[in-house]
């Protein structure tokens, strides 16, 4: 059963069960690598490191996703249609969160998500 994204004043929380956020970030990073190798004209990866991913899609949208191992959060900046949007830091507290957070990031990566106002920092 999927979890839900709960918006707080300063952060987002994925309401599910606990698995490490680092694993979620690593899966997302590998997903970007896979997309780069298989959709050659669709994505331009600018940086792909253990704690940061920066890439641009052919429609001009670009994304910077960082993982902070000290605070254990993912922070995402999205540049959509010449607009700079910073998504609130993502904190994950309880158990099945790996799949949910990965799905959230996957939706963002594939332009399938409607970014809600309460998610914006």
Question: Which residue ranges define each predicted feature?
Answer:
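Short aromatic-glycine-(Arg/Gly/Cys) micro-motifs in beta-strand/loop hairpins
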Residues: 2-13, 72-82
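Amphipathic, interaction-prone secondary-structure segments
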Residues: 42-78
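Intrinsically disordered, low-complexity Ser/Thr/Pro-rich tracts
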Residues: 3-6, 36, 53-56, 62-64, ...
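Surface-exposed beta-strand edges and their flanking turn/coil or helix-capping segments
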Residues: 20, 68-70, 79-80, 105
């Amino acid at each position: 059963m999927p979890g839900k994204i709960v918006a707080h004043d300063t952060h987002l929380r994925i309401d599910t069960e606990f698995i490490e956020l680092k694993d979620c970030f690593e899966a997302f990073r590998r997903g970007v690598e896979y997309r780069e190798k298989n959709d050659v004209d669709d994505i331009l990866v600018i940086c792909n490191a253990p704690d940061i991913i920066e890439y641009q899609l052919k429609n001009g949208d670009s994304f910077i996703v960082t993982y902070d191992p000290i605070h254990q959060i993912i922070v995402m900046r999205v540049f959509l249609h010449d607009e700079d949007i910073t998504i609130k830091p993502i904190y994950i507290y309880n158990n099945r969160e790996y799949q949910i957070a990965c799905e959230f990031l996957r939706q963002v990566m594939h332009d399938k998500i409607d970014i809600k106002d309460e998610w914006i920092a």
